Design a protein with these regions (language model features):
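Vicinal oxygen chelate
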Residues: 2-4, 83, 92-136
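Conserved catalytic-core motifs of GNAT/GCN5-like acyltransferases
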Residues: 12, 32-39, 104-110, 136
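Residue-level detector of beta-strand structural context in well-folded domains
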Residues: 45-46, 80, 119
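Short, conserved charged micro-motifs
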Residues: 20-21, 87-92
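Core segments of cupin and vicinal oxygen chelate
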Residues: 13-62
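Exposed loop/turn and edge beta-strand positions of beta-sandwich/beta-sheet ligand-binding modules
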Residues: 42-44, 76, 115
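N-terminal beta-strand motif that seeds the catalytic metal site of vicinal oxygen chelate
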Residues: 1-20, 78-80, 132-136
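Helix-adjacent hinge/juxtasegments
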Residues: 70-83
Length: 136
């Protein structure tokens, strides 16, 4: 029987400055910043939690033995889409109120479950952040 995944539990982003990045995601996207013990005598790690998901925030220069990770750790290389219950106009107003430049949108895009209305911006490392809501 083939293995089939059914959900994404967490992902890891590599960043230049954990404190700057986590504060941006907390302030702009309302994520909760948590510090956790990875076990094995390793240093504590920081994550961003929202809904039933989390993003582990890895310093791009962390030792690969200390933090087992992908072969290439480049800050600013992510392209992430987050879902919100807010309208695109509310997202635009929120981003503008916090001085975040809008790269594109609102625009219709194709999501995993249908048509999205998306607004794009960039996080402190330059990763592309898409904030979206599904059309009714």
């Amino acid at each position: 029987m083939p293995v089939r995944v059914h959900a994404l539990d967490h992902l890891v982003i590599n960043v230049a400055d954990v404190a700057v990045t986590t504060e941006w995601y907390r302030k702009i996207l309302g994520m909760e910043v948590k510090v956790f013990d990875p076990g094995g005598g390793k240093a504590p790690r920081t994550s961003l939690q929202f809904g039933q998901q989390k993003i582990n925030v890895r310093p791009r220069d962390a030792d690969k033995v200390e933090w087992f990770t992908a072969d290439h750790q480049t800050a600013g290389s992510e392209d992430l889409c987050f879902l919100t219950a807010s309208t695109p106009d509310e997202v635009v107003a929120h981003l503008k109120a916090h001085g975040v430049a809008i790269e594109e949108g609102p625009a219709a895009k194709q999501g995993a479950r249908g048509t999205l209305r998306s607004v794009y911006c960039r996080d402190p490392d330059g990763s592309l952040i898409e904030i979206s809501s599904y059309e009714d």
